[in-house]
Design a protein with these regions (language model features):
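Hydrophobic transmembrane alpha-helices of multi-pass small-molecule transport proteins
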Residues: 51, 73, 120-142, 195, ...
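Specific transmembrane alpha-helical segments of multi-pass solute transporters/efflux pumps
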Residues: 23-24, 52-102, 135-137, 219, ...
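Hydrophobic alpha-helical transmembrane segments of multi-pass integral membrane proteins
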Residues: 7-12, 38-53, 123-133, 152-156, ...
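C-terminal transmembrane-helix exit sites in multi-pass transporters
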Residues: 50-59, 105-129, 257-276
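Glycine-/small-residue-enriched transmembrane alpha-helix faces in small-molecule transporters
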Residues: 1-38, 77, 81, 85, ...
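Loop-to-transmembrane-helix transition segments
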Residues: 8-17, 60-86, 128, 152-160, ...
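C-terminal-most transmembrane helix of multi-pass membrane proteins
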Residues: 1-3, 44, 52, 217, ...
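Helix-helix packing/entry segments at the starts of transmembrane helices
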Residues: 17, 40-42, 84, 98-104, ...
Length: 297
């Protein structure tokens, strides 16, 4: 069976979403052994180094060393901020919440687009209201529905969505202009290296202390390096090159669903009624903001 390039791209993005969804659980469990800064730094360094070992098999050519370096540095920096703030949030929120709050980056993408002369579609405003309502319900405790129920961990993950949205814009440009495989490798190494330098300088006593790291902690680190970094992000790069922005964002939004499924299977995380309604509203809001601009009335 021969698939069209678009179908291949959608399959790659779906696999990436499943893999990303599966990594929220080990990201959560690994916090028993690692600090958020340690885990994020080594996760991307290891992933980048593993991929670098395959670079000799790539025939991609770099047309402009300057452009490649600048975009890779910028992408690596934004990726470091996105991954670290998300990981800090995962320490004190659930894997399920982290998955759905991360998906809010889809709402932020249009606002980032304003800086590159893209106008906002009216659908963004009802989507924000729906997702805000969903966020309050998702963080609710029992019958208590209040903004005060949104934890610091939830806020950190929501904050990370801003950087994920910026990173998506950078990647959207990079996949059209740069050799994707080499770009992926360099941005991962830059991301991990920047966090390593930061940790070594400003938190050296804790960052370089591995006495509490167990074999299971090492396993979860390597799983996230291989799964999230080597497989997930790399498939995203190649998938986005073959698929238009809207279907790509829709497919990647399913990451939240897979995160909830894996959290239920492995961690027995179960949403209460308010949580289920909230998660559904967030997902619907994310889907609506992508589909509405395509509907002709």
């Amino acid at each position: 069976m021969v698939f069209s390039s678009k179908t291949r791209g959608l399959i790659l993005l779906l696999i990436a979403s499943i893999v990303w969804g599966s990594t929220f659980v080990p990201q959560k469990i690994a916090m028993q052994d690692w600090s958020a800064l340690q885990f994020t730094s080594f996760r991307f360094l290891i992933g980048g180094i593993i991929l670098f070992s395959f670079i000799k098999f790539s025939s991609e050519k770099i047309k402009s060393n300057f452009e490649f370096l600048i975009i890779s540095l910028l992408s690596g920096l934004v990726l470091a901020l996105a991954a670290l703030t998300q990981q800090i949030g995962i320490v004190t929120t659930t894997a399920t919440n982290a998955g759905f709050y991360t998906s809010l980056y889809v709402l932020i993408v249009p606002f980032i687009g304003l800086f590159i002369s893209k106008s906002l579609h009216w659908s963004i405003w009802p989507s924000i209201i729906v997702c805000f309502t969903g966020s309050v319900l998702l963080s609710s405790s029992g019958d208590s529905i209040s903004l005060s129920n949104i934890s610091n961990g939830d806020l950190w993950v929501i904050f990370s969505a801003i950087f994920w949205a910026i990173h998506l814009h950078i990647v959207s440009y990079a996949v059209l202009k740069l050799p994707i495989f080499k770009f992926s490798i360099i941005q991962f190494i830059i991301c991990g290296f920047l966090l390593f330098i930061y940790g070594s300088i400003f938190d050296s006593q804790n960052f370089l202390n591995f006495t509490n790291v167990s074999s299971s902690g090492i396993f979860y680190l390597f799983y996230c390096s291989l799964g999230s970094v080597c497989i997930g992000f790399t498939l995203q790069m190649f998938g986005q090159r073959l698929v238009e922005a809207t279907p790509a964002a829709l497919i990647m939004s399913t990451e939240a669903i897979f995160a909830a499924i894996f959290a239920w299977i492995i961690l027995s995380e179960v949403l209460n009624f308010n949580g289920l309604v909230g998660a559904s509203l967030i997902f619907l809001g994310v889907i609506f903001v992508q589909l509405a601009p395509k509907v002709k009335i």
